[in-house]
Amino acid sequence: MKALIIDDEPLARNELTYLLNEIGGFEEINEAENVKETLEALLINQYDIIFLDVNLMDENGIELGAKIQKMKEPPAIIFATAHDQYAVQAFELNATDYILKPFGQKRIEQAVNKVRATKAKDDNNASAIANDMSANFDQSLPVEIDDKIHMLKQQNIIGIGTHNGITTIHTTNHKYETTEPLNRYEKRLNPTYFIRIHRSYIINTKHIKEVQQWFNYTYMVILTNGVKMQVGRSFMKDFKASIGLL
């Protein structure tokens, strides 16, 4: 699991990081001390669990928690604070737990186990749904070039772009160019992984390497092969939802 600790007190963050490492089972544990750092962390990582303090230097933790819950796939939120008067509000946000400082390892472990149990159940359900969806879509994409039909495995397709009537399909080991329109391929791609980010671009979200802020409040997506594709303004909402961004 991946965890994010949001607290403006360095000692509290350090203590919680230490306890989580003692409990074990975490692939990654990151920290944020304010809203800006939180948003940056959520942009580049999909977390399973967030430990959130109520009193932050630039925003109330309850308000931040409400924003996080609006994500397409929000992480489990555990409020970790010295203030007990916000517990009702926290659970109204469907918080997984509410832990009071000073932290104890046993209490933290109880909260983590709640998240793990819920995640295991959700993963099983998601796997079943994904298998059903995959069954309804071809696993290979037929691409006709020079009287030959190439069968491209969808998991190897990194992104597809079109310019001046030429559609370029980027894969993990080759680049294919065709005059077929982008819309033709969009209908055949598995929507579990592929998303249109621009009228000229479709990407495989499994091949996103990095997302950079760009002009006019948009993003530039850098794919695993180094190709850059800009997110169109009208596609921003769907793109942010697809990568779990606020």
Swiss-Prot record:
Post-translational modification note: Phosphorylated and dephosphorylated by LytS.
Name under which the protein is recorded: Transcriptional regulatory protein LytR
Keywords (A to Z) from UniProt: Cytoplasm, DNA-binding, Phosphoprotein, Transcription, Transcription regulation, Two-component regulatory system
An annotated GO cellular component: cytosol
Main location: cytoplasm
Chain positions with 4-aspartylphosphate modification: D53
Domain Response regulatory: 2-116
Function, in words: Member of the two-component regulatory system LytR/LytS that regulates genes involved in autolysis, programmed cell death, biofilm formation and cell wall metabolism. Also participates in sensing and responding to host defense cationic antimicrobial peptides (HDPs). Upon phosphorylation by LytS, functions as a transcription regulator by direct binding to promoter regions of target genes including lrgA and lrgB, to positively regulate their expression.
Lineage start: Bacteria, Bacillati, Bacillota, Bacilli, Bacillales
SUPFAM superfamilies: CheY-like
HTH LytTR-type domain mapped to chain residues: 141-245
Species of origin: Staphylococcus aureus (strain NCTC 8325 / PS 47)
Consequence when changing D53A: Complete loss of lrgAB promoter binding
